[in-house]
Curated annotation (Swiss-Prot):
A Pfam family hit: ArgJ
Site (Cleavage) residue list: 194-195
CDD domains per UniProt: OAT (cd02152)
Keywords linked to the UniProt accession: Acyltransferase, Amino-acid biosynthesis, Arginine biosynthesis, Autocatalytic cleavage, Cytoplasm, Multifunctional enzyme, Transferase
Family: Belongs to the ArgJ family.
Record protein name field: Arginine biosynthesis bifunctional protein ArgJ
Amino acid sequence: MALEISRLFPQNIQELPSLSGVRIATAEAGIKYKDRTDLLFIVFDKSASVAGVFTRSKCPSAPVEHCRISLPHGVARGVVVNSGNANAFTGRKGKQTVDTIICAAANALKVKKNEIFIASTGVIGEPMEASSIVNLLPSMAKTAKEGNWLEAAKAIMTTDTFPKLATRRFDCGGETITINGIAKGAGMIAPDMATMLSFVVSDAAISSQMLQSMLSEAVQESFNSITVDSDTSTSDTLMMFATGKESFPCITSKTDPRYEVFSKQLRALLHELALQVVCDGEGARHLIEVHVIGATTDNTAKIIALSIANSPLVKTAIAGEDANWGRVVMAVGKAGVEVDRDLLTIWFGEHRLAINGERDPEYCEEKIGAYMQNKHITIRVDIGLGTGKATVWSCDLTKEYVMINGDYRS
């Protein structure tokens, strides 16, 4: 099914710079899609340190299980990614498929099996044959080339309507460092982690322990703060790799001043990728930004913000460009944390709609109606009980979302 490109499509798709020793190949494996690439092979010519964050679903895919087992080894030489089949809930055969692909990739690169990582995205519960992937890996290992990031982002798309890429180039301790990232995701997007798949590579030298610390911290304000439909995928995978410039001494401690410099840039890059995922939410026509302030703690603020952002009634109101702030009140009330109805204040953009538990006396339907036609809608709620605050991002819920997911397997 051909999908209309999201109206929240970024005006300019970034061109990502090449990273020395990072080679990329894509291919058409015919797993589900015809006449498009659906297989990605990232090759590291030298050992790269690795970190990862994965789904908290209790039904994780076979690729996720493999990555969790291999991650403590701390070294990566290759990543195999396919779209069209999640290889999730596929039992023993799914694990055998992963093992077969891992062995083939390791043989193609002449490296250890625990230095190969794998990710899959697509339909859940359908067995996946390894042969269509395995047969392509030897030639892909030979033809992989530096650059090719746009093609990499395209190869991992499923219901995405545009490829998602971001890059940062900055000074870190007197050395110019680059971070490149790609992501995919449009549906089945909810926190913990979450996007469906994302891969980030830097030429900095960072120990796997510090890389894991940076990634785990950075994900909280990015992929763990977005939601499209409140559904957490079985396959969510965010992995980061650091190849290590020889001229850049390795970061091995949080006390290294470069740790925070790098972390700041990583947070910005992940935030950019996460917003691209939300902007490509299936059928999305509005980006929704939810700010909650005045909660008892930051954690309760985030719970309330997610309750608002995940509410089908709030999301459909935004889709209909209807400032139905009563649905925000409903979402706050059902969050299950401490609130006081008579202290609530609600804004849509700069328009205050409710104050101290009732409609604002200066409420103007005409003014707020004009605001609701914007592509980017901001909802701000003051709980009035403390200093806790949180921000999450979501998108509206449209008829197109139902159509896309109703036809997903056809």
